[in-house]
Amino acid sequence: MNPRGKTFMAAAVAGMLMVAPQSQSADGPGPIPSEVPGPSTRQATAPTGRQVVNFNRDWKFAKGELPGAETPGFDDSAWQAIRLPHDWAISGPFNPSEDGYAGKLPWRGVGWYRKSFTLDQTDRGRRVYLDFDGVMAFPKVYVNGQLAGEWDYGYMSFRVDATPHVKFGQANVIAVLVDTRRHGTRWYPGAGIYRKVTMTICDPVHVAHWGTYVTTPELSDASATVRVRSTVENHLEAESQVDVEVVLLGPDGRVVATGSKSDTVPAGGSQELDQSLAVKNPQRWDIANPKLYTARTLVRVGGKVVDGEDTTFGVRTFRFTADDGFHLNGRRVQLYGACLHHDQGPLGAAFYPRAMQRQLEIMRDMGCNAIRTSHNPPAPELLDLCDRMGLVVWDECFDKWDGTADRVNREPLQQYGEKQIRNFVIRDRNHPCVVIWSIANEIGPQSGQREGMSAENVKFMSDFVRKYDPTRPVGAACHIPQMANQPILDALDLTGWNYGRRYATYRQRYPDKPIIYSESASALSTRGFYELPLPTGKTQYSRKMQVDSYDHNAAPWSDIADREFQLMETDRFVAGEFVWTGFDYLGEPTPFSREARSSYFGIVDLCGTAKDRFYLYRSCWRPDATTVHILPHWSWPDRVGQNVPVYVYTNGDSAELLLNGKSLGRRTKLKEVADSSYYGVTDKYRLRWMDVVYQPGELKAVAYKDGKKVGEAVMRTAGQPAAIRLTPDRQELAATGEDLCYVLVEAVDEKGTLCPLADNLIRFRVEGPAEIAAVGSGNPLSLEPFQADRRKLFYGKAMLILRTKEGPGGSVNLTAESDGLPAAHVTVSSRPVQ
C-alpha cells in the first residue's frame, strides 16, 4: 500500500478501479511505433441495416440573419456552395485594428447553412438522426422548416432526431442557424459547422447514441473480464423483446469471445443489457504498442438482426499516485505532454483528421506521449488517433466557468454543466487513451456575481462525471496557489497546476493526492528569428514584435523549457507536464497582443514547421533518439568578424563545434547546475559556444554520448535564392474531398542550401483533382489571407495545404513561381477510395 494513503487506480478502456499487478519499472516515453496508422472512422461496420452516411457534401452557406432561411422554399441559389467542415471566419479579411486575442478575424456574426437530401421510401418507419460533432456556436437545426434541435456549447457533439420532420421519397431541406455573437472566448474559436456531420438511419429498436459502454473490471496477463453494457432504445408503440449479442474481436480481427443476453425494452423507452465476457491472454493497450479490440453489438428482434455497431476499446491498467506519478500497465511512465488548441492553423477551426494526425505525428516525434485537449472537448477523431498512436489524453470539458465560453448569461452553472458533461463523458469513455476527466481550467474562487470555483460547484461537477464513468480520476487545471488552503478542491481526485511550481502549496495541504503539471513553460519564440545581442531576461522582447529563437524568452508568469526540465527531474511525485503549447495557434499573441494575430507559445509554428525549441524538447524527451541541431542559421552578412553565439541541442552529453574545419572546442552538459542565475540551468540541457566569431562557410557539430559519436549536423552560409524547393509530406492521397497534403515551400541557393532570410512572394497553381485549402508561413504578424494562391516566405519558408477532390483521383500537379526564379513543380497522386 502507498504509505501516503490515497492512490487513484484505473484499468482498461474505461476500466474499473484496480491495482496493477505488474512489477516492471520504467520511466520515459518508451519506444515510438515505426508506423502511424491512418485515422479511424469509428462508424458501425457490423452486418446490420444501420446506415451511417457522410453528411458533409453539398451544403450552401450565407452570412447574415436572413429571415425565413429555415423554410424549404427559401431561395438559396446565390449562396456559396461549400463542403463541411467549414469555418466561415478563416477566409478573413483580417482586421488590423482589432486586438489579436481572437486572431483579428471576423468570427462574430450570424450564418446559415442549407442542404437538400432525399430519403428512400424503403426507409419509411426507420429513425433518422443527424449527428453534429461541433458547431460554433448556438446552432438551431431546422428540418423542413421545423425546429428539430439546438445546442448551446460550440465544442460539444450533439444529436438531433429528425424523424418527426423528414419525408420519404421526396426532397428534404435541413437548415442550420449559427450565431457566434453570444459566444465568449480567449482565443480564436472559429465560426460555423466546423466539424463533421453524419446522418444515421436505423431501426426503431436500436443501440442508443453512445449507448455502448465497455470496461474491464478484472485484468491480468492470463485473462481479462470485459464488461459490455448496451443501452437499447425502443421507439415502437409496443414493448420489444430483444436479444443482444456481443462479439469481441482481437487486435488481429479474430473473434476472442462472444456473449448474448435477452430482455424486454418498454415501448418508447430504453433498457440496459449488461454482459461480462472472458478474454484469454489479453494484449494490452500501451504507449509503445497500442493494441485495440472491437466490441461488436448486434440487436435481434424475432431472431432477425435489426441494428448493431462496433465500439473500439483497449485493455490496460493505470493509476496516479501521490508520491510516484503515473503508472501504465504496472510501470511508471513520465508524462511528456503538450497542450493543443482546437484550431488547425491556416485551416482555422475546420477539423480535418489528416491535419490532426500530422500534428500528433510531429508531437510524437518530439517525444510527446500525452495530449491535453485545452480547453474543450476535442473532435472525436482526435481521440481515435490517440487510441491508435499510443498517446494518453487529459480530456478537458471547460475553460473558465465565468462566461468565457458559451455560457454567457445563460442557465445556472450546474444545469449547464450537467448537460455538457453527460455528452462529454459518454461520448469519450470508451477511449483507452483517456486517463483524466478535466472539469475546468484556471477558475478562480467565487466572488461577486462570477461563477467561480466553489466547493459546491466542484463537487457537483466531479460527482456528475463519476455518474457516467467512475473509472478515471476527475481533475482540473488550477493556477491560484491560495486555493489550496481552502476546501474548494477536496472533491477532485487529482489536480493539475499551471506554471511556476504553484503545486507546492497544494502538496502541503493534500499530501495524499496526485499532482500533474497541467501547463508548463509558456516559452516564446518565432521560427527563424534571431536578434543580437541576446536578451538578458525572459521578458526582454524584441522591438520588431517577433520573439528571439535562441529560446531565452517566456511569458511573465512562466519559464523557459530548461527550468521546467529541472523541475520534472526534481519533483518526481509530479506525474508529468503538459507544455503550453505544442503548436502556435490563432489568438492570444502574448507579448504582442495588439499587433499580432497568432501565438508565439508553440514549440512548432502555426503551419507545423518546427522551431528550434522542438529539438531542445526532443533531445530531452527522447534521450535514445539521435538529435543534433545547430542554431542560429549561418547567414549573417552584416556580422562578419563579430560575435554570433552558437547553440547545439542534442541527446548527446557533449559536442564539438567546427567552423570551416577548425575546432572551436568541445562542450559538455553539466550534471548539476552551478550557476544560480536564471539562465544557469541551460548548461544542463544545451551546449553553448558564446564567443564564436562569425565567418561565412560551414558550421559543423559532432555530438557524443558516453564518449561515442551519436551524430552530426551541418549549417552552411546561403547564397542568393536560386530556386524554389517543394517538399510534400505525402505522395499518395485519398480522393475523399477531405484528405490533405502539406507542401513545404523553401527558397534555396544554387547548392540547395536554405536561404534563411528570403521573403520572396511565391505564386501557386494546381492542376488535377485537388485544390489549395490554405497557405501560411508561420509569421504571427502577417495579415495575408490564408485562402489564397500566393504567399510571402517567412525566413525562407512557407506552407501550402492541398485538399483532394472527391472522385476517381489522378495526378495532382503543383507549380510554384516567383519573380527572378525558375518555376518549381511537384506531383502527388490522389487515389479513389473503395
PLM regions: where:
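Short flexible loop/turn segments that cap and initiate beta-strands
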Residues: P72-D75, S240-E245, I287-T294, N651, ...
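Extended acidic/polar, glycine-enriched regions
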Residues: K167-G169, R229-T321, W689-G697, A703-D706, ...
